[in-house]
Amino acid sequence: MTPPLPARDDDRPELSLEDKFTVDEGIIHLTGVQALVRLPLVQRRLDLAAGLNTATFISGYPGSPLGGYDLELQRRRKLLEAHHVVHQMGVNEELGATAVMGSQLAMQLPGPRYDGVLGLWYGKANGFDRAMDSLRQANLAGTVRTGGALALVGDDPTAKSSPTPGASEVAAAAIMMPMLYPGDVQEVLDLGQHAVALSRSCGLWVALKMSTTVADGSGSAFVAPGRVQPVMVDIDLDGKPYVHRPSTHMYGARVMEMEHSLVYGRMRAALAYARANDVNRITLRGDNDRIGIVSTGKTYFEMRQTLRELGLDDRELQRLGVRLLQVRMPYPLEGRIVREFAEGLSEILVLEDKRPFVELFVKDELYGLPDRPLVLGKLDENGTWLVPIHAELDTVSIAKLVADRLLKRAAPGELPALQERLERITRPRSLAPLAMSRTPYFCSGCPHNSSVAGVPTGTVVGAGTGCHVLAVFMRPDEVGDILGITAMGNEGAQWIGASPFSSMSHLLQNLGDGTYAHSGSLAIRAAVSAGVNITYKLLYNDHVAMTGAQPAI
């Protein structure tokens, strides 16, 4: 028999699952996605305390690692409504972005109901790419000082639930959208508030890069009303104070004026904000530093954990002359902190996922200095590969990189413990064999079980984005010879380019109902326009379970 629970101490506060969203001060436990839900609630309370009556408009399209964001918003609908938060999911990413752009124009329309509106767009890195035209125009149009606009971008660097690996820094830089990169749940909360203040200060959208481990992960965070106290900056343009007014009048000389304010005013204000608020931080330094390590976002925390596993605490790192720089705003990279960090160093190692990004800005900032350190990143001093440019950095890869640079500078036998720990961390580990191999398959009761199957043997079938892509793992005699997939919404368009050069006369193309509503109907129109022989099989299940589970049609 289960013993009865002890009597409750009436002095203890009542606990609620909504505490993570409503508690003003204390320690809370939440996921990265839940931290994004908390963000507009906190901002509403902060604005009210400052005498501003503001609201929030949220739109976008779900996709991992932000696949559960819309669901979490729906679960907290009453709480959001009480904080004047409106969530309207976009039909697709670009329409959602344009809707959020509209939130910054609302104050210019007759009868504004609020002092300002905070706009939040959300989507995965692939959707960020897809929405580039809309986001470029929205960023150029700008934000209002009492509102602001953020792009919450879900990066899936190892393509765990994406057709391609995701890294959004380059895309953000291409449209001159400042980016902040939180590395854990605490930083999602802190940098989220900074992102709002930055957007309001500089009149630009601000991207918040959410990697898979941060969005899906959970942790404890400390919250308090005064924990983040942004220092707002003013925009100076051509030597005069400048107040940005959002505008979509993008034609003729006017659009050139907007670009001028973007490049010479608003981007400079973003850099000034980074300086004034110490967004990027030198987290460890000593008197005799010779080696510097620069890292961003979640990779910074991976690096710190790896150093501890190597037996390198702060005291030992200082003894070895190691200095650390945490970059939380990779674009635009503020140069003053880079020059301060590099002073006196002989070597800098830049640790970041994917292609060189921060590394290039560091090199550019230091290039003209007479006494500049060697900057290593994707390549070493001999031009050979060093930091991996594919997948993502983890404990093993970081341990090899850091230990190798330290051991090269140490005298023989000076760091035996480091060598021993490195060998232990990087030693291959044998995995227990699985008793049974389980191939991914559709959920029980899902219509895909029958709608994808039953294809005549030898039929060539185009797969598509959605749960039904699992057909690539299934037997050809059940689902046909799978040709492969395209970008979401382009299903079947590959046949337009292939059919003139093949003796095959027909293609069967799978198309999910969610993708059809998102943008797939255009692919059907394209196939009709091209006059190709193709059959579209519209797969209905009313959910997008691999990304968000929102109603498809």
What do these predicted ranges mean?
Residues 47, 53-60, 447-463:
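Carboxylate/His-rich catalytic cores and anion/metal-binding grooves
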Residues 55-61, 86-90, 118-123, 151-154, ...:
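Short glycine-rich or small-residue beta-strand-to-loop segments that form or flank ligand, phosphate
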Residues 35-51, 61-74:
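N-terminal glycine-rich anion-binding loops that anchor highly charged ligand groups
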Residues 1-39, 43-46, 182-442, 447-448, ...:
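Flexible, low-complexity linker and terminal segments
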Residues 71-76, 164-168, 307, 361-366, ...:
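Short, aromatic/basic amphipathic alpha-helical patches
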Residues 44-52, 77-81, 105-113, 142, ...:
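Alpha-helix termini
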Residues 64-201, 211, 452-453, 460-546:
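Thiamine diphosphate
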Residues 13-25, 51-54, 75-83, 114-119, ...:
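Gly-rich Lys/Arg/Thr-decorated short loops/hinges at beta-loop-alpha junctions or inter-strand turns
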